UniProtKB/Swiss-Prot annotation:
InterPro entries: Ribosomal_protein_uL29, Ribosomal_uL29, Ribosomal_uL29_CS, Ribosomal_uL29_sf. Belongs to the universal ribosomal protein uL29 family. GO terms for biological process: translation. This is Large ribosomal subunit protein uL29. Keywords: Ribonucleoprotein, Ribosomal protein. GO terms for molecular function: structural constituent of ribosome. One of its GO terms (cellular component) is cytosolic large ribosomal subunit. NCBIfam families: L29 (TIGR00012). CDD domains: Ribosomal_L29_HIP.
Length: 71
């Protein structure tokens, strides 16, 4: 739980460019995980949910910032 608070505070301090950079890296990692799973090489399947949740957190932060800039 404490790690989640640290992650959220880290996301709120990153710039938009850094967030997009991290988002692209996570999407590439998710693609690689899917590729490994298709080949039967993936050992740690729980990594899927962690990467997907991280992508969702970054997208949420980006949406929050874009909505706050509109007003």
């Amino acid at each position: 739980m404490n790690d989640l608070k640290l992650l959220r505070s880290k996301l709120s301090t990153e710039t938009i460019e850094e967030l997009y950079k991290n988002l692209n890296l996570l999407k590439k990692e998710l693609f690689n995980l899917r590729f490994q799973q298709a080949l039967g090489e993936l050992k740690n399947t729980s990594r899927f949910s962690l990467v997907k949740k991280s992508i969702a957190r970054i997208k949420t932060e980006l949406t929050k910032r874009s909505n706050s800039e509109e007003y």
